[in-house]
Amino acid sequence: MQAPAGLAVKAPLIANSDLMSGKPSLIGLTREEMGEALAEIGVPQKQVKMRVSQLWNWLYVRGVSDFDNMTNVAKELREKLKAAFTIARPEIVEEQISNDGTRKWLMRFPPRGAGRPVEIETVYIPEEGRGTLCISSQVGCSLTCSFCHTGTQRLVRNLTAEEILSQLLLARDRLGDFPDGSTPVGAYVPSEGRKVSNIVMMGMGEPLYNFEHVKTALLIATDGDGLSLSKRRVTLSTSGVVPEIFRTGDEIGVMLAISLHAVRDDLRDMLVPINKKYPLKELIEACRNYPGVSNARRITFEYVMLKDVNDSLEDAKMLVQLLKGVPAKINLIPFNPWPGTNYQCSEWAQIEKFADFINQAGYASPIRTPRGRDILAACGQLKSESERMRKTERLAFEAMMIANHGADD
């Protein structure tokens, strides 16, 4: 279903009773774990490896979400699989499509233990040569970064490897990115190749506070016999959980991004409070030692541009000094407004001056084009619906944003 640009689509709600049944999912299991699960339902040990390969292909190459579609699996085994496991997608509570083609899905996952169902947001950003999916790793966030909307939502829980991967699987479903899939009429997607070519762990939450589940999900996403994403097209963004940075490069091997945002400890303590635990000196040293870092595999430093806070040319000079010797590029992010914030975006002319100074010092300094602002899908704007403002306030704000879209950019 295609919606008018910038308006919310109430997607047909699928109850997904299979997902809500409490049955364990095969999605997100390693090959070893999947083999153990199959053995537990009676698959003969000599067949386990072959059956795992079959299921892996159906789940991650063909993209099926129903055991009945696994046509080369014997019916008796399919019935056993259906009785014991689920491979269902999460519910789509809402799908929104921005004026610029950005899509945002509000997804609902079932309770874990005694908890309640939870909601998270996932964003798809299409461009001519690539399609980037921004994936969440937690429900809410514990970091309370003062400029970030997600940081105003308390941490509810970590997402499982299944729930992290399901965001990618659902997006590929909706965009027709699996074999035999069809792209929605009028959808803005890359003209060639995969619709989802890149993923960034930049959604809700701090990925390195959920290291094991994120690691499992990303290793499955980059497995050459399945989803087969290149590790050079997967970026994990952290606010600076220093002890896990080396492990990220060593055990996962994806590209690294650092949510920097300030070049002085006193300011970063305020903007990104984790800096009080892991100050800039420790953070930059961890970046210097990141496995595989080189001019071909640079670390991205994200820097949100806040008017009269961190956008002076003196800040730019200190930034260049701070990163001296680190293979890096600096993404400058115009601040994306959200209801209740006290911050303002830097003037565009000041952002360009800042970028020019960094560029002349030898660092690539692209200014990130704001995407999805009108549906609160831009950087720093994500927050699950159940924790957002009252509905009337939200609708009024979104109407204002839609009316002003274009003037902002």
Swiss-Prot record:
Entry-linked Gene3D superfamilies: 1.10.150.530, Aldolase class I
Short name of one Pfam family: Radical_SAM
Cofactor binding description: Binds 1 [4Fe-4S] cluster. The cluster is coordinated with 3 cysteines and an exchangeable S-adenosyl-L-methionine.
Molecular function GO terms recorded: 4 iron, 4 sulfur cluster binding; metal ion binding; rRNA (adenine(2503)-C2-)-methyltransferase activity; rRNA binding; tRNA (adenine(37)-C2)-methyltransferase activity; tRNA binding
Binding annotation for [4Fe-4S] cluster: C141, C145, C148
Cofactor(s) of this protein: [4Fe-4S] cluster
InterPro entries listed in its UniProt record: Aldolase_TIM (IPR013785), Methyltransferase_A (IPR040072), RlmN_N (IPR048641), RNA_MTrfase_RlmN (IPR027492), rRNA_lsu_MTrfase_RlmN/Cfr (IPR004383), rSAM (IPR007197)
Span of domain Radical SAM core: 127-376
GO biological process: one example: rRNA base methylation
Reaction it catalyzes: adenosine(2503) in 23S rRNA + 2 reduced [2Fe-2S]-[ferredoxin] + 2 S-adenosyl-L-methionine = 2-methyladenosine(2503) in 23S rRNA + 5'-deoxyadenosine + L-methionine + 2 oxidized [2Fe-2S]-[ferredoxin] + S-adenosyl-L-homocysteine; adenosine(37) in tRNA + 2 reduced [2Fe-2S]-[ferredoxin] + 2 S-adenosyl-L-methionine = 2-methyladenosine(37) in tRNA + 5'-deoxyadenosine + L-methionine + 2 oxidized [2Fe-2S]-[ferredoxin] + S-adenosyl-L-homocysteine
Family statement drawn from the similarity comment of this UniProt entry: Belongs to the radical SAM superfamily. RlmN family.
Protein purpose: Specifically methylates position 2 of adenine 2503 in 23S rRNA and position 2 of adenine 37 in tRNAs. m2A2503 modification seems to play a crucial role in the proofreading step occurring at the peptidyl transferase center and thus would serve to optimize ribosomal fidelity.
Record-given protein name: Dual-specificity RNA methyltransferase RlmN
